[in-house]
């Protein structure tokens, strides 16, 4: 069965994210001297939707601000790519702590909460959304509380607790790694620090050997893995990009987050060899666009990308939408998990899908 999606049915304003999508592009500081306001953006889109779409396409394919050498986010991302998103010492440390806490048994949430209380004298408190408006978590050292919004689901709550434990117990190791990266700005260092702290939290929730063994035993069945480790699809996808331990390597996935306009919000290459910003693939028939028409469904697709490469590679992609707990701005995103097509026969979700033709939606 193939999903029913006609890209020609999209209006141009929908394909570029409407006024919001166009306004975001116009807000680039390269255009700051022009003083373009929202009303002008609306007029441009209404009067010349095809021209607006052409501008958006050129903007997205140009060297974005995130790729500038002096851009903190781009600098931090390139540092992560040098490690192939695998931080061996911290991964081992998180695995040892997971074993110590016996996170494979019983209620994981209880074990994490007890660690906070016994080692750090911190309690975890769930607060009404109106008490922490716009926030999903807050550390109140005066009250000795990690305060979490009621808007967070179970997986998100466990992640926030694990992240706080990572920050408290591995701060020195994380700081040493960040300082050793030789980044040029405090902002870039903070971005890398946040990423590595998230990494440790995920490694605590999905300890390396146990997680890799489950991946191999289930043929990387994403549905089973989400249930077995009680994590979200987003958390699972990020962890799958990290499996590069020497002698115990997993499959080389990349992970990308997109908004409805197809604008890339986040990209993690892992060891996949995929190159940001996935040149040659931004077009409506690619699977991230279709996920918004089939909310929550896991869609699959074989594609080719690698514009400018001598031999563009074939990839297998899995994608679905996610809802971000308690965060309005990114309330709906598409996550794409991908790896080279030559590895796809090792995935449960690829079974029964023909390798060709490419650039068409799969079952």
For the regions a protein language model found, what residue spans apply to each?
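Short juxta-domain linker segments that transition from a proline/glycine-rich
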Residues: 2-363
């Amino acid at each position: 069965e193939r999903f029913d999606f006609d890209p020609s049915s999209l209006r141009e304003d929908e394909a570029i994210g409407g006024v919001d999508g166009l306004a975001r592009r116009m807000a680039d500081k390269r255009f700051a001297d022009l003083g373009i306001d929202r009303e002008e953006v609306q007029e441009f889109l209404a009067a010349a939707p095809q021209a607006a779409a052409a501008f958006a396409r050129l903007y997205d394919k140009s060297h974005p601000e995130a790729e500038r050498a002096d851009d903190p986010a781009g600098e931090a991302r390139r540092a992560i790519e040098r490690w192939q998103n695998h931080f061996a010492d911290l991964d081992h440390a998180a695995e040892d702590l997971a074993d110590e806490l016996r996170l494979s048994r019983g209620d994981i949430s209880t074990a994490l909460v007890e660690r906070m209380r016994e080692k750090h004298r911190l309690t975890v408190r769930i607060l009404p959304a109106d008490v922490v408006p716009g926030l999903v978590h807050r550390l109140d050292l005066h009250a000795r509380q990690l305060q979490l919004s009621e808007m967070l689901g179970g997986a998100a709550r466990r992640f926030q607790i694990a992240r706080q434990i990572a920050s408290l117990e591995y701060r020195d190791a994380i700081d040493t790694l960040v300082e050793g990266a030789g980044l040029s700005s405090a902002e870039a260092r903070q971005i890398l620090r946040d990423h590595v702290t998230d990494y440790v939290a995920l490694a605590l929730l999905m300890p390396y050997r146990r997680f890799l063994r489950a991946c191999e035993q289930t043929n990387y069945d994403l549905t089973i893995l989400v249930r077995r480790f009680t994590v979200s699809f987003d958390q699972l996808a990020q962890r799958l990009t990290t499996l590069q331990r020497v002698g115990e390597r997993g499959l080389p996935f990349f992970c990308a987050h997109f908004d409805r306009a197809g604008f890339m919000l986040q990209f993690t290459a892992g060891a996949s060899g995929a190159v940001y910003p996935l040149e040659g693939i931004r077009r409506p028939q690619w699977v991230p666009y279709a996920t918004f028409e089939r909310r929550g469904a896991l869609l699959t697709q074989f594609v080719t990308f690698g514009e400018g490469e001598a031999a563009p590679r074939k990839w297998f992609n899995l994608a679905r939408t996610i809802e971000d707990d308690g965060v309005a701005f990114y309330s709906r995103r598409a996550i794409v998990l991908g790896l080279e097509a030559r590895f796809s026969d090792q995935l449960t979700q690829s079974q029964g899908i023909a390798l060709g033709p490419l650039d068409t939606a799969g079952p």
